[in-house]
Amino acid sequence: MASVAVEPQLSVVTRVANLPLVSSTYDLVSSAYISRKDQYPYLKSLCEMAEKGMKTITSVAVTSALPIIQKLEPQIAVANTYACKGLDRIEEKLPILNQPTNQVVANAKGAMTGAKDAVTTTVTGAKDSVASTITGVVDRTKGAVTGSVEKTKSVVSGSINTVLRSRVMQLMSSGVENALTKSELLVDQYLPLTKDELEKEAKKVEGFDMVQKPSYYVRLGSLSTKLRSRAYQQALCRVEEAKRKGQETISQLHSAFNLSELARKNVHNANQKIQDAQDKLYLSWLEWKRSIGYDDTDESHCAEHIESRTLAIARNLTQQLQTMCHTLLSNIQGLPQNIQDRANHLGVMAGDIYSVFRNAASFKEVSDGLLASSKGQLQKMKESLDDVMDYLVNNTPLNWLVGPFYPQVTESESAQAPGTTRRPGRWSRKHPKPVPVSNAEGSQPDDSSS
């Protein structure tokens, strides 16, 4: 005997939502909301941001409550069966639930119009009687429609309240509360308070006022605003730090280039005495070392030693400048393409300057033309850094405010061997890496090398 397939029973919430009267009312409200949103662009952007936040929170709530729902699935199925039976009886008593809103209104209008036409055509002389008859029909129709709608509202409200008071919904609410609290803690941990927020917190502590705990929706909106503001401030601080280090390195490289020019003019000038050239070069070397915070008066002051140390430090500084440029480029994603192209050009110029000193063993291998062009490139880099920072301060990138605030794994990180620890990549674009430098050339000499 062939087995009969049993159709899965719909949940009571799905059945209530699928009722023609409920679904048609929802469609009317939804269409009114969409039309209003399309009429006002600013309202549309705010509504879309709110919808996106609600979708994220709903996804977190569903994920948190899924194990609990699966555990209580038998009890939920039994409760759903009883609720569906009760809904069946209600639908039998109230056929209006299976009619859409426009049909209910049309039927009411049709009944009133038919009664009016029948009374008008048959008894034209009895105006008072016709008027009273029409009034009675209208009142009875309105009473029937109003009573049906009120009963439907009471049934739906009662069902919703019953579900909300159930243990399952209480557990779900608890899960959502825990998820929101955890999100707030993570934001405070990874995105510390800004100066303005610290001042507000200090004022709250001084007042000792009892503040009532805000509602769930207020906390949700505050979390979204807090996340956007702190993420923007942190990104701005990273770019400011990159700019500061870059300008310091550029200033030190200017001094190194000036020292190189001085060495070329004095050491290799046959018209001057060698001893005078060495003394003058040594004094300039000491002055530059003190300006960058490196001072050791015990080392040799021969021209060859100063020459090798100057070239080594110049290589180290140009490598630092190259690394800083790539760090800056990785932190300004979301800015207009012309700003990103300018930052990318900074890295190219830093690589060109580094190539000048990379393989140079003496000042003879660095011509005056290369030094002059390198100094010009340093000045252009300083101006570009100022332009990028000015744009960031005066123009906030929109996608830095609305997200997404999540790391994207780059190709090099996805190919990394398992088990290794590395910070998550911030952007998906691959950037050129600075040229590696050996310890003998790239690092600043220490006292032992003297």
Swiss-Prot record:
- Membrane topology, as annotated: Peripheral membrane protein
One protein family per Pfam: Perilipin
* Localization: Membrane; Lipid droplet
Primary location group: membrane
Q: In which tissues is it expressed?
A: Milk lipid globules.
Cited InterPro entries:
Perilipin
- Indicate where the modification Phosphoserine is found in the sequence: S215
Q: Which GO terms describe its cellular component?
A: cytosol; lipid droplet; membrane
Q: Which residues carry this modification: Phosphotyrosine?
A: Y232
Q: Which UniProt keywords apply?
A: Acetylation, Lipid droplet, Membrane, Phosphoprotein, Ubl conjugation
Q: Spell out the residue ranges making up region: Disordered.
A: 411-450
The family database entries (SUPFAM superfamilies) matched by this protein are listed as: Mannose-6-phosphate receptor binding protein 1 (Tip47), C-terminal domain (SSF109775)
Which positions carry N-acetylalanine? A2
Specify the superkingdom: Eukaryota
Q: How is it modified after translation?
A: Acylated; primarily with C14, C16 and C18 fatty acids.
Q: What does this protein do?
A: Structural component of lipid droplets, which is required for the formation and maintenance of lipid storage droplets.
Record protein name field = Perilipin-2
Organism of this sequence: Bos taurus (Bovine)
Q: Which gene encodes it?
A: PLIN2
